Amino acid sequence: MNNDIILVVNQIEQALSLLHDPKSNNKQREESQVFLEEIKTRANAHSYAIAIITTSNNDILKHFALHIIETLVKNRWYECNDQERELIKKEILELMRRITSNEPKFIKEKLVTILVDVIKRDWPQRWMNLLTSLIEISKISDTQTELVLSTFGLLPHDIIFDTGSTSQVLSDQRRKDLMAGINLAVTSLFEYFYQLLESKYTQYKQPTPATTTTPQQTKQVIHLINVLLTTLRSYIEWVPSKVIFDHKLDQIFCQLILDVPFRMGACENLILFLGRKGRPDERIELIQTPFNFMENFLNSIKINSDFEDDYSFHKRITQALTILGTVHLNAYDDKHKIPNNYNIYLQLMLQMVSHPSILLSSFVLPFWHTFIKVESLELSYLEEVIKQIMETMLVKFVRIGDPEKSDSEQSKYSEIDFGTSKEWSNFFGGVRTRYLDIIKLITIQRREMAYIFIATKVADVLDALKANLNVASLSHEQTLVLESHSHILDSILLNIKDFTPESSLFFNKEQQQQPNIIQLTDRVLNLLFEINSTEPNITSFQIDCLQAYILYYQTNPESIKFLLNKIVPLIPFPGLDNPNRSFQNSVLHTRRRAISSLIGISTNISHLMKPYFDILYKSVVELFQKNVVTETEKVMLFHLLIVFSNNLPSYQQTLDFYKGILTPIIEQWVSLEMSTALSSPDAFIQYLGLSIADSQNLDATLVSRRKNIQYVASTLQIFWKKSQIPTNSSDELFAPFISNGISYNGKWPISSFVKQVLPGVLSLTRTLHQLWMPEHRAKIHPSLSTIFNLDDSITAPLLGFEYHKEQKSESSNVTFLRNILDCLRDACYEIVGYGFNHSDELFSLPDLPLVLLDSVFSYLESIENRHLKLLVKHILNYLIKNCPTKLEHTIFEPILPLLFSVLFNRIKAGWELIKLRSQKGEKENEKNEIVEDKILRDVSMEFLMCCSNIITQSPNYIFSSIDVMTPMVYGISSCLMAMDTPILKKSLIVSTQLLVDHEKVNDPKFFKLIGSEMFGCCIKILIVNKFAEFSNDIQSIIRLIYMKYYQICNYPQEILLSLPNITPPILQAFNKDLISTRSEKSQKVLFKKLLQDVIGIPLNKLKKESILDLPEKLFISKISDQSNENISNISNLFN
């Protein structure tokens, strides 16, 4: 080593010392960093690195030396001469030979990384003896063995699998050379792997006197075997299956799952082995060994070591078993027999699906979904297996296992898998849907068995309830069990009705071939009619079960009178005066379930309910006269009556019916007291007493006002929302007509009340918008200030918490006032929106735009995003859909520029705030991150839906108004940049809708808007490349815009010229190629080449290393539920 090299090495050591010394100042660190970076770029930098590697014992210095070599290999390898390259390769291998077990891990890892980088550039042509050298090195000690295994394990990741770094380094030819080399070497490699595994496993399992091992040596042997299993994972997916079978690795994996130290590695290799690509017959060959060793799988889950380690293994082996069974079923046909030990396998899968862990049990659902769909399986015990599945689904459907409630076995596992109740709740909701999917499949294929199963279960529960009628109240878990039974009963009966042939005969007593179905149904219904409980949750269960039997009532209409005799008396269910708040809430739920069940039944079988209309009407009137129902229940009862009135034969009859109910309501609505209260924020605040402190002893008049205004507005809302056109209107001189392309059978009876109702609705809407202004909010008493916040019943589910009224800490008056404000706003928006839907009454107003701007579209700067979402959804969309073409310019021109500008500014500001928050790493409170962001997504989605509607409904207007098009395009561009999957997906659809089939976008006034703003926005999204799955869609938008504009304006070219590597000559050549290219496919190829090869935007989707890299919770959604003819290989399920 010459003196110059020694001098530089000493300088490097000093610079590193200063860089890592906490006492160094910033200037010293900066100078050291600059010097060290300059060293890496020197032509003879490798000589310093080799000098350090061969002489120094300083770990930091050696690590920097390896960095020097890594920089050279990655950036200047092909600039080095042969002598320099050979020297570096020799020193790397020498270092590998000398390295000891005490060497820091970061040096070992860096050494392996460098070696693989050199291999990628020189092997096999310029390093033919590499593999021999590595295998010889591995014999030196266990340390060298581990390094060699790590090298072999890392190599395929950069060659076989396409990663971002590899795609930039390796040419296609280089990749082919490496593939050829590794394929030639794979047989000898696997011989080495096998011999090493055999040797080390024998040493672990059967140490001889000559090889007696210490605990530390045993630990090292275990470690080496696990490193080898990790290395095998890099090959097991793609090497020829013959190589695996020749070395009996499939059998070895099945054996190793019985050894606690190796079971996880063996299981992960099995997952990759079973997920190999191949033809059906090849895949059938893969599964033979695991089925033959099924006893090992069964025994492996009985081994107890450490609770969490055991559980982790159980999750992995469940994934392996699921893939095993799914591969078999997807390749199954008449040529293949049922595998050996299939009964043991199904026993295991039943055990796994009934496991207390919601996550683990969810892993097997894809298998059972596929299993049920394969109807050709010939198993003598098939019916019994299906019954056990249904039994399990019924048990698992009960919502138990919250990790923050550690009183159950399910919760113990949830604590491991889920950090919060929110995470668990979201996951449970998705899995619960999958339970219903499986029940649906079983019902479609075996409807009699499915019904008998659930009806028997319900009957048994009812028998138990009948024997214990004196129970004061049910526990929360008992209530959940009842809810699961009624829910699944409803699901099965609904599936029988909608998805099975001749469902109308299912409950036909004369044609049903299984008399036990009729007998069982009679037993269930008799119990439901007989039981009279004072416990509200039991009564709710009865109501839910009775509502589920709509199919039975269709076939046996004589039972309807018994149904009504049971449910109608339950409407005023007693118990609202109970001091227990939880009991009160259950009573309210029961009363409302009774009414909603009547609404549901009447809606579904309205023709059979007609004879009972008078009886029901008299019952409702009697309930009103006795004043035994609340205001909310009155509105629900009005809904019930509307369902009946929608079937009245004539317009006049319907109108007279409405007048009988609405006349007193409208009288209150137009009264001087009410009109004054709705006219301004000050009057509204005074009328509702919003400036008065919250108190439990409020003035009765004030309480009455609050209840009454909500009752009146809700009644008007329900009539506008649920009423329909009488089917025979045309018989009474109301001829069918068409408005804006929509065909109407006749006149809407409810629209006769527009002139009376609308002024108050518009006045109230304006007042509500003003109420959110700071100067008016300041007039609200501080004790009521939270009425402007979202209610816990809305935020709790968004945050993943269960909501229970009895856990609410705020005053009931505050909650009620908040509900009043929300109810009034919803009522106003829906009355106006449905008014647009009720033909032409509103559109006949001569000053409609001014009326709307002065009311529903006034003070928009004050309202919140959640209100803006409702306004767009309930008013703007209906206005756009129903506006007559001849009035579009008159109505839209004053309104849409203002409204679209507001929406654009809200959307842009909202997504920029989220982006800024993520860049700064700020952690705001959970409500801001979840609730507000969720509302912003909803606003963005409603805006995009609105854009889609107006492009479809009013293309002539939208392309004639730059004042509307400008904020609309800017808004769509903001949604494109939102980096949110659903929003981006919808934005791409709307963008395509805007550009395709509308030649008017070629108007010069849109050139900059679309050719620059939207085009540039799409380029930015590609560069960020966070959503590889949308890459092709974004490229299509880019191509569409460019093809429309590149010959008539310069805006798209200006965007491209601002990007790296794009010069005027390159762009001119590109345009010339486009002119000569006519096919869309060829255009796509040109654009992809320009974007990827010239500009350097990474367009290729990156492949996951393996299915093992998927988060466990995504596993269930990645296993396919498709039938075998639609799936070619299991690997596709995880891409």
From Swiss-Prot:
GO terms for cellular component: cytoplasm; cytosol; nuclear envelope; nucleus; RNA nuclear export complex. Keywords: Cytoplasm, Nucleus, Protein transport, RNA-binding, Translocation, Transport. Residues 32-117 form the Importin N-terminal domain. It is found in: Nucleus; Cytoplasm. Residues 630-631 are annotated as: Pre-siRNA binding. One of its GO terms (molecular function) is nuclear export signal receptor activity. The record marks R706 as: Pre-siRNA binding. Pfam families: Exportin-5, IBN_N, Xpo1. The keyword Nucleus applies. Mediates the nuclear export of proteins bearing a double-stranded RNA binding domain (dsRBD) and double-stranded RNAs (cargos). Belongs to the exportin family. Found in a nuclear export complex with RanGTP, exportin and pre-miRNA. This is Exportin-5. The gene is xpo5.
